[in-house]
């Protein structure tokens, strides 16, 4: 009897392990697959992939394997799925031009669990719907009316958060700035206390999306699920209130992005629309806060570049009345400032890369990619390829003068039909931040030689970028 119990106990452990091992290996029994390693059952090479980012070199996972296999493509196993990782301009072009033909957007299962939908549609289908709803609000003709509002928020931000400070940490403040703008433009929310209440759970959700999806108390994933529920409840309340205001004619459809979506989305549960808004708020502030942070970093490191940015912004100021807000025409004159921001995004892409799923069998560079496999493309590895950018570690905004980089070599916003719909929104936000920053302040890094970053999942300075700040004379 005792031996039988032991046998059953051991069998209950071994047989599931053998099943998962067999399933794990069966994914890689196709002919002529790309070279590469599959790692351990279930987790594959996920820990190595995440560890590279947390150690400050998110491109290292890709570049080390590209160098080892010399194929421009390799296989691995990430987030519970078999993966092909494609690299370089040719890989980017292949994925971007075959969107919805051979590949579609894909996110780890953790996304569906953090943002559960009450509908039968997948996160991919929901993302397409959200994208279609957002597009009209992100066109230049729609964004023009936001410039003055963004400028006003920026002025208040620097007055309340930066002025009269001797020393501060940049990253938390850029997140506060971009989140305030997102809340104002998406939800007409300008109550600072309410904005602060939402900011922390947004950060918790973002860090949990690419964590190991183990829903146990205390894990990142578990905290992200709880934070998502809290956000959904709060945003659903805002949605119900806005519906009543629109019905009563108290607000305009043009007031903000939420009002526009409500008038065009049709029958949708408040909770599902709340998830769409939450996703937009994450996308609308998280990546741009990273760019703004590293703009501060590189302008501190290169005083001659700071000076050129300052001169460009002074020229714009000299043609405006005191207290006159920025306009779209002013933004269009910030060419050198935008070159600086572009070089920041080349060296530190706010998204290291994204995922796709093969919806059919196909070949790339002579290797077979099975239907159902996932794919990953790396912006960081492409941007630091000396074939495309000589001396890739050198900060050189002139790379973006004239015709700029060759197609598919510079991809901070992705490309093809899936190119980021908010790229013009991001450009406005970054340039308005730069304008208000340099016109008011000079600064220096507290730790001049400290350049370590941590990608978890997005890249941030390891210490948040402490600076000493001085009023502009």
From Swiss-Prot:
SUPFAM superfamilies: Cytochrome P450. It is found in: Membrane. It is an enzyme of class 1 (oxidoreductase). Its cofactor is heme. Its EC number is 1.14.-.-. The keyword Iron applies. The keyword Transmembrane applies. One of its GO terms (cellular component) is membrane. GO terms for biological process: saponin biosynthetic process; triterpenoid metabolic process. InterPro entries: Cyt_P450, Cyt_P450_CS, Cyt_P450_E_grp-I, Cyt_P450_sf. It is a single-pass membrane protein. CDD domains: CYP90-like. One of its GO terms (molecular function) is iron ion binding. Keywords: Heme, Iron, Membrane, Metal-binding, Monooxygenase, Oxidoreductase, Transmembrane, Transmembrane helix. The chain crosses the membrane at residues 1-21. It holds the Pfam family p450. Heme binds at residue 420. PANTHER family: CYTOCHROME P450 26, CYTOCHROME P450 716A1-RELATED. Possesses triterpene oxidizing activity. Catalyzes the C28 hydroxylation of alpha-amyrin, beta-amyrin, and lupeol, producing uvaol, erythrodiol, and betulin, respectively. Catalyzes the C28 carboxylation of alpha- and beta-amyrin. Possesses 22alpha-hydroxylation activity against alpha- and beta-amaryn. Belongs to the cytochrome P450 family. This is Cytochrome P450 716A2. It comes from Arabidopsis thaliana.
């Amino acid at each position: 009897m005792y031996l039988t119990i032991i046998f059953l106990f051991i069998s209950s452990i071994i047989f599931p392990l053998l099943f998962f091992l067999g399933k794990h290996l069966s994914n890689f029994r196709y002919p002529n697959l790309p070279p590469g390693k599959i790692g351990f059952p279930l987790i594959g090479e996920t820990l190595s992939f995440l560890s590279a980012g947390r150690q400050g070199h998110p491109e290292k996972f890709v570049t080390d394997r590209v160098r080892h296999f010399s194929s421009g493509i390799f296989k691995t196993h990430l987030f519970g799925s078999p993966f092909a990782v494609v690299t370089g301009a040719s890989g980017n072009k292949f994925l971007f031009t075959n969107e919805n033909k051979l590949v579609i957007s894909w996110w780890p299962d953790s996304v569906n669990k953090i943002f559960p939908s009450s509908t039968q549609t997948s996160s991919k289908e929901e993302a397409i719907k959200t994208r279609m709803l957002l597009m009209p609000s992100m066109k230049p003709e729609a964004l023009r009316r936001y410039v003055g509002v963004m400028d006003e928020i920026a002025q208040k931000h620097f007055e309340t958060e930066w002025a009269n400070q001797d020393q501060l940490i940049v990253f938390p403040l850029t997140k506060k700035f971009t989140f305030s703008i997102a809340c104002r433009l998406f939800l007409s929310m300008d109550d600072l206390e309410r904005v602060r209440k939402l900011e922390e759970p947004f950060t918790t959700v973002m860090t949990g999306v690419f964590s190991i999806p183990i829903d146990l108390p205390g894990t990142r994933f578990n905290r992200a699920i709880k934070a998502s529920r809290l956000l959904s409840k709060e945003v659903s309340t805002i949605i119900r209130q806005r519906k009543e205001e629109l019905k009563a004619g108290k607000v305009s459809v043009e007031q903000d992005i939420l009002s526009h979506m409500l008038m065009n989305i049709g029958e949708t549960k408040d909770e599902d629309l709340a998830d769409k808004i939450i996703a937009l708020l994450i996308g609308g502030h998280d990546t741009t806060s990273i760019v703004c942070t590293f703009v501060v970093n590189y302008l501190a490191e290169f005083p001659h570049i700071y000076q050129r940015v300052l001169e460009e912004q002074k020229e714009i100021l000299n043609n405006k009345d005191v207290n006159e807000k920025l306009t779209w025409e002013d933004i269009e004159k910030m060419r050198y400032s935008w070159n600086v921001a572009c070089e920041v995004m080349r060296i530190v892409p706010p998204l290291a890369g994204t995922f796709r799923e093969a919806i059919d069998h196909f070949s790339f560079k002579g290797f077979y990619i099975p239907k159902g496999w996932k794919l990953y493309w790396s912006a960081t590895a492409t941007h630091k390829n000396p074939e495309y950018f000589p001396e890739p570690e050198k900060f050189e905004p002139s790379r973006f003068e004239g015709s700029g980089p060759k197609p598919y070599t510079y991809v901070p916003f992705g490309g093809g039909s899936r190119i980021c719909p908010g790229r013009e929104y991001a450009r406005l936000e970054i340039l308005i931040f730069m304008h208000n920053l340099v016109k008011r302040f000079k600064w220096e890094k507290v730790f001049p030689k400290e350049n370590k970053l941590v990608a978890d999942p997005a890249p941030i300075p390891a210490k948040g970028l402490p600076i000493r700040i001085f009023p502009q004379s």
